[in-house]
A protein has these predicted regions:
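Membrane-entry signal-anchor segments at the cytosolic-membrane interface
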Residues: 1-11
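Aromatic-capped interface at the extracytoplasmic side
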Residues: 7, 14-37
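Extended amphipathic alpha-helical segments
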Residues: 28-30, 79, 83-86, 90-101, ...
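Long, amphipathic coiled-coil "stalk"/hairpin helices in large membrane-associated assemblies
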Residues: 30-87, 151, 164-168, 195-197, ...
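Elongated periplasmic alpha-helical coiled-coil
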Residues: 40, 47-48, 78, 104, ...
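A structural signal for short beta-strand/turn segments enriched in small hydrophobics and glycine
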Residues: 52, 60-69, 138, 145, ...
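Short hydrophobic beta/alpha edge segments that flank linear recognition/processing sites
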Residues: 64-83, 143-148, 173-192, 240, ...
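Hydrophobic alpha-helical membrane-insertion signals
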Residues: 166-168, 179, 185-287
């Protein structure tokens, strides 16, 4: 009987020790399975309206900064550019004419005082200023027409991955309306949600270990980039405050809120590709 009690006591002590060790490990190194891979997503938006004539990429392809993505029919913008050039020539001629008329009148007035009324000289001077303004406006119109012509070619603003490509040859695109997303290749991070009670003693630059659900046998080393300073309230009026909304797991009991923590990886294995939205687990190593 005593032997049985001793065995039970030993088992209870062992279980208690294991539980205490795990608790201490979790307290010193909090972890969460509620993590996701994130990255900056750039909306590729044409600056001009028109019909797409060429598409040089396919969905989910990799591109380099400066790669040509697609072209918009330039016909209208070529015509506008030539029209702006013609208007500048006309404005140049009118400016030269106004300047010559003013110069002749002033020379005549200089030779014979009173030969040209003061009002006429004033009107001629105003005509020159108006012609000069029209000339500057014509120059600006040329610059605008040239920009619009350049905007018919849409380039990748950074290295990254094309996703959600919704444009084809013949599609009509509208200025300032996104047509494709570009995931910035150099902006990946892991975002995990930790209970507020787990963040005591956690600081930016603390080390972290990340495990992806897709590659749970590979531990990725990283460090904390930032800790969220606010989340949106679940209930109540918050307005358009742009704070992240983190829904609690349970509604019927009072639980610690979850705060977003961003982790950047120190190095990526060459055979491992991060994708936005992948599930991840994060373990923080306190200093």
């Amino acid at each position: 009987m005593i032997k049985r009690y001793l065995i039970t006591l030993i088992l209870l002590c062992t279980a208690g020790t294991v539980l205490y060790t795990h608790y201490q490990t979790y307290t010193n190194n909090p972890w969460t399975r509620d993590g996701q891979v994130s990255a900056y997503v750039i909306s590729i938006t044409p600056r001009v309206t028109g019909q797409v004539t060429q598409v040089y990429v396919v969905d989910n392809s990799k591109v380099k900064k400066g790669d040509l993505l697609f072209e918009i029919d330039p016909s209208t913008y070529v015509a506008s550019y030539h029209k702006a050039l013609a208007n500048q020539k006309q404005a140049t001629a009118l400016l030269a004419k106004a300047q010559n008329e003013e110069q002749r009148a002033r020379k005549l007035e200089k030779r014979t005082h009173g030969a040209v009324p003061a009002l006429t000289l004033s009107n001629l001077h105003n005509a020159v200023q108006t012609a000069q303004a029209n000339f500057e406006l014509a120059k600006a119109n040329i610059e605008e027409a040239q920009l619009n012509l350049d905007f018919t070619k849409v380039y990748a603003p950074t290295d990254g991955y094309i996703t959600n490509l919704n444009v084809r040859v013949g599609s009509q695109v509208v200025a300032n309306s996104p047509v494709v997303a570009l995931i910035d290749e150099n902006s990946f991070w892991i975002e995990g949600y930790f209970k507020e009670t787990d963040l005591a003693g956690i600081a930016p630059s603390d080390r972290a270990t990340v495990t992806l659900l897709m590659h749970d046998d590979v531990a990725l080393e990283g460090k904390i980039k930032s800790i969220g300073f606010g989340i949106a309230k679940k209930d109540g009026i918050t307005g358009n405050d742009l704070l992240p909304t983190v829904n609690p797991n349970f509604q019927w009991i009072r639980l610690a809120q979850r705060i977003p923590v961003k982790v950047t990886l120190n190095e990526m294995p060459k055979d491992l590709q991060l994708r936005v939205g992948m599930t991840a687990s994060i373990k923080i190593i306190k200093h």
